[in-house]
């Protein structure tokens, strides 16, 4: 199964193709200026550059946030259109979930944080790859305390607010900043091949 992943929940958007042997192709966009029609054109070019046809796609995976409402709406609209046109399933993957997966932390706890503007952050905490609770929308001071607590436990912190907004110095290797379509596609493929039911985006 080859899966198309879309992520436009942050200013840096991306699209990627993930197959049985891993990443096939990836492209990045300025999500602040992106419209669904432009994303569809970009996806068509991405598929062609990978030497594929749209009919080769077996599922679509989309970043469903939290993040930019406008950006998420663009990716969801594009994914719904592509999935409906091809008659393939679509899967939603949370932006914080993709960030945590990219940290490749193994058994260590992970906290993922994304800029929510207005001195706030979207926060998700994970234990052994699973969400430890619901995602939260927190004041930066509270988010910082959560991140420091996770790091004190030997955990990993990822996200675009860690240094610029929270002033935290990151441990070596913790450079994951934003959700990436490659991870969205990878996680979507895992759900597709395991027979997970699709859900409304």
Roles of regions detected by a PLM:
Residues 50-56, 83-93:
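Phosphate-handling active-site elements
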Residues 174-201:
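Acyltransferase
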Residues 39, 43-46, 50, 96-100, ...:
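Generic hydrophobic alpha-helical segments
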Residues 36, 40, 79, 96, ...:
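A general structural signal for well-ordered alpha-helical segments in protein cores
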Residues 61-89:
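DPxDG-like acidic metal-binding loop motif
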Residues 22, 28, 34, 88-180:
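Surface "functional belts" at beta-alpha junctions
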Residues 46-50, 85, 103, 184-194:
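Stable alpha-helical structural segments in soluble proteins, enriched in small hydrophobic residues
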Residues 1-66:
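N-terminal beta-alpha supersecondary unit
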């Amino acid at each position: 199964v080859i899966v198309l992943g879309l992520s436009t929940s942050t200013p840096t958007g991306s699209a990627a193709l993930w197959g049985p042997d891993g990443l096939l192709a990836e492209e990045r966009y300025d999500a602040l200026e992106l419209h669904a029609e432009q994303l569809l054109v970009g996806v068509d070019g991405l598929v062609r550059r990978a030497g594929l046809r749209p009919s080769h796609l077996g599922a679509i995976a989309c970043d469903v946030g939290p993040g930019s409402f406008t950006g998420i709406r663009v990716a969801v609209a594009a994914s719904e259109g592509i999935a409906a046109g091809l008659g393939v399933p679509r899967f939603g993957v949370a932006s914080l979930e993709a960030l945590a997966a990219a940290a490749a932390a193994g058994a260590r706890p992970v906290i993922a944080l994304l800029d929510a503007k207005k001195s706030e952050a979207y926060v998700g905490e994970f234990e052994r790859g699973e969400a430890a609770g619901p995602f939260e929308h927190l004041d930066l001071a509270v988010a910082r305390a959560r991140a420091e607590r996770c790091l004190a436990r030997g955990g990993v912190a990822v996200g675009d607010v860690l240094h610029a907004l929270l002033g935290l110095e990151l441990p070596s290797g913790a450079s994951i900043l934003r959700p990436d379509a490659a991870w969205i596609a990878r996680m979507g493929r895992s759900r597709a091949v395991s027979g997970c039911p699709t859900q409304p985006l």
